[in-house]
């Protein structure tokens, strides 16, 4: 089983050119799947039937996986089994036609303008704070994914024209603009970056000089949010969602927001129209004479 998996990782990395982050996610899901199969004395992919796939989902749910994680596990397994079909090792994909449990619809959380101002109201001159502020300003200004920001190099950024070149999902490149506040924050960071003794061309580096990790960015954002007095947990997703929501509120141009976010499907971007509508509905309920609730 592991031999086939190793060939699959090579296929994803070399032929599909998937990001290391995406491959790691798939590895985690398929490693967990193999453990479940081993408990059932299944040691060959040819032994996997539709019933076995359903058992994997049931066992995963029993282990505490939520709907979104179950869908990810099924997707990872289905893609791998499709690869085995293409390679002629399986005749059919046993995961075809099997659906993960329905996911509940959750609106992404975002911050309002006042919270953004509160978040960024910090003019600390400590080099690590200058770096973190540049990360925050760029993530909010451009709506970058965590993996996109973490993968930026020095030559990815142009503060003169205020554009950043990012590699998104599926190894797709796009150019995204950023604002003057982000530009200033990045220029301030570049002045002190050498103090970290950088070992490569990564735009953002750790105190050891290496490219800053996904986990380190998450932890630094969480710490920054607490220090700035935010009532809710700060994470990269929240900054991206806030960017998308505020752009849509200001422009109503769904296609433009789709391009900026790097969404391949417009349906992915459309969730922000629901978020925007919810905000408008709340304003309506509070303001309209015929909508005000009785106290």
From Swiss-Prot:
Q: Which residues form the Tyr recombinase domain?
A: 106-285
- Indicate where this protein is primarily found: cytoplasm
What keywords were assigned to this record?
Cell cycle, Cell division, Chromosome partition, Cytoplasm, DNA integration, DNA recombination, DNA-binding
Q: A single GO molecular function, which one? A: DNA binding
**Catalytic-site annotation from UniProt:** 145, 169, 237, 240, 263, 272 (o-(3'-phospho-dna)-tyrosine intermediate)
One cellular component GO annotation, for this chain's record? cytoplasm
Xref: Pfam families:
Phage_int_SAM_1, Phage_integrase
Q: InterPro entries, alphabetically?
A: CB, DNA_brk_join_enz, Integrase-like_cat_sf, Integrase_catalytic, Integrase_recombinase_N, Integrase_SAM-like_N, Recomb_XerC, Tyrosine_recombinase_XerC/XerD
Which Gene3D superfamilies does this one have?
Answer: 1.10.150.130, Intergrase catalytic core
- The residue ranges of the Core-binding (CB) domain are 1-85
Its annotated compartments are:
Cytoplasm
| UniProt GO BP | cell division; chromosome segregation; DNA transposition
Record keyword Cytoplasm present: yes
Name the CDD domains on file. INT_XerDC_C
What does this protein do, in the record's words? Site-specific tyrosine recombinase, which acts by catalyzing the cutting and rejoining of the recombining DNA molecules. The XerC-XerD complex is essential to convert dimers of the bacterial chromosome into monomers to permit their segregation at cell division. It also contributes to the segregational stability of plasmids.
> Subunit details for this protein?
Forms a cyclic heterotetrameric complex composed of two molecules of XerC and two molecules of XerD.
Q: Which family does it belong to?
A: Belongs to the 'phage' integrase family. XerC subfamily.
- According to UniProt, the name of this protein is Tyrosine recombinase XerC
Q: Which gene encodes it?
A: xerC
